[in-house]
Amino acid sequence: MVYSYTEKKRIRKDFGKRPRVLDAPYLLSIQLDSFKKFIEQDPEGHYGLEAAFRSVFPIQSYNGNSELQYVSYRLGEPVFDVKECQIRGVTYSAPLRVKLRLVMYDKDAPAGTVKDIKEQEVYMGEIPLMTDNGTFVINGTERVIVSQLHRSPGVFFDSDKGKTHSSGKVLYNARVIPYRGSWLDFEFDPKDNVFVRIDRRRKLAASVILRALDYTTEQILDMFFDKVSFEVQGKSLVMELVPERLRGETASFDIEANGKVYVEQGRRITARHIRQLGKDGVDQIEVPVEYIVGKISSRDYVNEETGELIAAANQELNLEILALLSQAGHKSIEVLFTNDLDYGPYMSETLRVDSTTDRLSALVEIYRMMRPGEPPTREAAEQLFNSLFFSEDRYDLSAVGRMKFNSSLLREETTGSGILDHSDIIEVMKKLIEIRNGRGEVDDIDHLGNRRIRSVGEMAENQFRVGLVRVERAVKERLSLGDLDAIMPQDLINAKPISAAVKEFFGSSQLSQFMDQNNPLSEVTHKRRISALGPGGLTRERAGFEVRDVHATHYGRLCPIETPEGPNIGLINSLSVYARCNSYGFLETPYRKVVDSKVTDQIDYLSAIEEGQYVIAQANAALETDGSFSDELITARQKGDSGLHPRDHVQYMDVATNQVVSVAASLIPFLEHDDANRALMGANMQRQAVPTLRADKPLVGTGIERSVAVDSGVTAVAKRGGQVQSVDASRIVVKVNEDELVPGEAGIDIYNLTKYTRSNQNTCINQRPTVMPGEPVARGDVLADGPSTDLGELALGQNIRIAFMPWNGYNFEDSILVSERVVQQDRLTTIHIQELSCVARDTKLGSEEITADIPNVGEAALSKLDESGIVYIGAEVKGGDILVGKVTPKGETQLTPEEKLLRAIFGEKASDVKDSSLRVPNSVSGTIIDVQVFTRDGVEKDKRALEIEEMQLKEAKKDITEEFQILEGGLLARVRTLLLSIGYSEEKIASMDRERLFALTLDDESLQNQLEQLAEQYDELKAEFDKKFETKRRKITQGDDLAPGVLKIVKVYLAVKRRIQPGDKMAGRHGNKGVISKICPVEDMPYDEKGQTVEIVLNPLGVPSRMNIGQILETHMGLAAKGIGDKLNEMLKQQQELHKFRNFLQKVYDLGDTRQDVDIAALSDDQVHTLVQNLRDGLPIATPVFDGAPESSIKELLKLGDLPESGQLKMFDGRTGDMFERPVTVGYMYMLKLNHLVDDKMHARSTGSYSLVTQQPLGGKAQFGGQRFGEMEVWALEAYGAAFTLQEMLTVKSDDVNGRTKMYKNIVDGDHRMEPGMPESFNVLLKEIRSLGINIELEDK
């Protein structure tokens, strides 16, 4: 296996046995590809902005004299880059400019004669852009648009499963769902009539819609029924016979032909009888005249002579009618073929309940149903009916809908019109009746072939179209007003509605969510989330059990494990690792093709619909070296059911063992040994892990950590290979390899790192370089680690030495006992950054001012502010300290004589302002790490703002100059190489300055051209950098665009260091969560025979009932991994030769029957040295999901690390020194500190705000509320008989307004008595009873 430069520094031992066929795809592609489709120009106009424009334009005026045509669009450049947008609190977006053409026709000339054409580019608002990491910056905060899983457009056949009607009869229905437009439902009622509903309104007989399509009763019967014809021969009737139709019926007369009786009267007709009739070629039989009674006429029968109607179509026949027919000379009579078994008379019955008779009455009926109360006219009724399903403006099935519609009706072609036609409606009704007749199946709406993904691009396109449609109306009216000669396209278009629609979607849609930025995994997972909620989706309350359940088609598409606990369970899912979206929006998953029982490397992506046709083997099926199956019978899936199949039946095979699960679940080692419920918690809790101060890679991982860290975008990744030229804390410079250069560029890549910035969840984002100057790097190598990454691998927690044993009750009920050493070493210390802002506004009484001159504030409180009244960077502050001094003008009040005197002495200024400074919240303390000042255009900047501006300019200049010098150095190096190649000496070149070098004249023309080209590049580069600096300078110095009425905003960033403490929540990766109960001194912790203490003690009772055995295996494996590291340390101490290290490492990497092939001999001595140094803390191990290390391998590894194979050690009590009576399971587990910190939850209230109505204290920390003393707590006090305590709780401590003010006074006076009064909530109760019309009064006795 080939390792990149970064991977060679620390090679993870992989226990996976199945060969890697397909690497995990780029994890954010679902977001990026979708948005790319939206903004990229599509010449076909099938999707994106192009499709939206084409669907609305051209817009014609009502009189048809002019039209506005769309030509093309382009997106401009964003004004600010992503980082600037985040700092300034603005949206990262680009202006959309559309080229429109206004065409005016000559109304006097023949139609279509053009009078005038005007073309112009029109601004149509801003389109938010996606960052490289798949997020949007909206008003300065990073947001994610979650993809939606919704019901695919098309036609669905379903039944009520017998739940609607009391008889339990199953009622079938069909529903045509368009992408946009009216829904069309057909349904059976308990009497077996077919009804139609439009948009779920009042139902009409289904034949109404057929009549509205201009079909007569005769034509309708013709479409839905087979016919039987009878010949009148004298006194008897001869019926044409189709033997198949007789199956299952009981003969009401002898069936005979040619003198042979086939079935006697009263006997049931069986398949044998039918075969016999067919064999003898019987196609006619004589039937008694009574047989036709009750049959239904298929057409109108008229007396030719008199013109009188004898029998109408759909009329029941009787002997009287038969006699009349015979008299009128009708020798042949056609009736409908129906029976009770599989040819029901449904449509015929429906026609009987239908009150309409012709097209007009049907249209009027539909109009009345859609627009009740409006008087129908013929034109209005026709226009409404046509616009429902037959107009492209109002109705669109979409490409997906048409494809699903056609495949559901078993048609060959997958494409077609977006609107319905007559045959579509008729075929849907026919199929519904077929299903009712027992032929055909209903659809499963939870099948992933019937649910599709709507991603960012598609949702944004829909919103954009909504905005355009709003504009369309205004344009039409404006075009019809006349006087178009002076008008240009931009006068017609108002961009506001478009901007508003787009802004509303990105800012406040249910699917536009504040990004979960706890750690890189939570970012990736949030972008790969699939929600069934949101506009056009389900609601929590209506979603039943079936929708939430795992479906067989989720396999390899949606993760069966990762979903939230609580009301959203099953409605919010996560994409599986390898899943992708196809062009129709259905989820696909990859499979390896099997040809002649041999697995090939050809990979096919199959959607849920396609997958149903194949037999698919699991990824762990045993294979021979040539790729053929080892076993005769293979465990495989077909149509969602697992079973054993002969190997020659298998057509596909899974690509990887972790194909089924999502990214978070595939990060759990030994997942296959955990119960699903706990795995769900484990996957969810990894997303809540806070990045620790020093990231620590997991000793026991699954091998997917690297791709998560790289794809999440928190690390700096090399765009091209090369050599690291220089590294400092904030920048890495790479000189690009010659073969990766674009001709004519300097060949230097510069990576600027992010330092100590705040994430959405107030955690700290900071990047640290992982490379050294001079190191070679390849494309895709990790150059700098971000939060929670270690050498390019995801590192959410810390490897901690743990023991499973009870310890003095401190680990009762999942509590966790932690050693003081963990705190001392800052293993689980995290940095949190808070942003506090202070806004100075223009008020009615005058403008607020940011100043250090604050009334009634002592010198000490101002000690941390500078002269502008803003706290300085580096100051350590605690709750209540002033960060930004601000004064607000006060309204005029009645002055006391003393104040009047002060005014007279000191002038006006003494008391007309009040202190409204920004202070540190009560429970917070920390260090100021940054201050930003934003000043409105036209407002004078204060000294601090100017200082910050100057510093930013200096930094920008330094950055740009350094960047320029690096690139200039690159260019000059190429000039030097050029001159050296034609014989110039090093000294001579060194003695010449840049101007002289570029001014040289060379004899060789091609070299001269090259030199001139380099000189030209230098000039271009200089001009580009000057322009870059000028742009940067303008951005820094110009005033800021602030909200109306805001003069100044000061943002202060406060960093808080949080050590682990009792009350913090921690968890492993297997759903084993707990709260820290005690931080125990190191000397009291249990220790082993070597004197090594454990750092955390967990309760062994947390394992058996939870069935997450994975944690035990991880602990053993962790011990073995650490043992290898300890052995390497021992060898280093003994200063053993390098070849011994090579041999030992080779032995370690070769252990077990695995796919990994590490050749230590191929590494250089330096690389081996780096590898050994990086393995001293322990050997990182990968045990892939469902392909993990077996027990035997763990034992072998423990043996190699000189540890007992049981994984259990003899332990001693730290307090007494006594040995525990049996060996204890000790090892290393990866523990996470979750973002549920006691500091954020701890809260106490003395007095505070009260609710307006009930006068009771508010609830919650944010409102500084009280603790609710509820019903059950009252019972507890009643049980104790604590009457006075209870009285105090229900009155003065809660809502007895007079009592509590009196109590306050009494306490101030040192008198601790209380006088309870009437609780306010009693008055509320009285008022509520009175509002019900019951007069209730309290009588004082």
UniProtKB/Swiss-Prot annotation:
Picking any one GO molecular function of the record gives: DNA binding
Entry's EC annotation: 2.7.7.6
Q: Read off the Pfam families from this record.
A: RNA_pol_Rpb2_1, RNA_pol_Rpb2_2, RNA_pol_Rpb2_3, RNA_pol_Rpb2_45, RNA_pol_Rpb2_6, RNA_pol_Rpb2_7
Ordered alphabetically, the record's keywords are:
DNA-directed RNA polymerase, Nucleotidyltransferase, Transcription, Transferase
Concerning CDD domains, the annotation shows: RNA_pol_B_RPB2
Q: Which GO terms describe its biological process?
A: DNA-templated transcription
Q: What does the record give as the reaction this protein catalyses? A: RNA(n) + a ribonucleoside 5'-triphosphate = RNA(n+1) + diphosphate
Q: Which residues form a coiled coil?
A: none
* Alphabetical list of PROSITE patterns matching this protein: RNA_POL_BETA
Q: Which GO terms describe its cellular component?
A: DNA-directed RNA polymerase complex
| Assembly with partners or alone | The RNAP catalytic core consists of 2 alpha, 1 beta, 1 beta' and 1 omega subunit. When a sigma factor is associated with the core the holoenzyme is formed, which can initiate transcription.
The role this protein plays is:
DNA-dependent RNA polymerase catalyzes the transcription of DNA into RNA using the four ribonucleoside triphosphates as substrates.
What family classification does the UniProt entry report for this protein? Belongs to the RNA polymerase beta chain family.
Q: Which PANTHER family match?
A: DNA-DIRECTED RNA POLYMERASE I SUBUNIT 2 (PTHR20856)
- This protein is called what? DNA-directed RNA polymerase subunit beta
Q: Which organism is it from?
A: Photobacterium profundum (strain SS9)
Q: Which gene encodes it?
A: rpoB
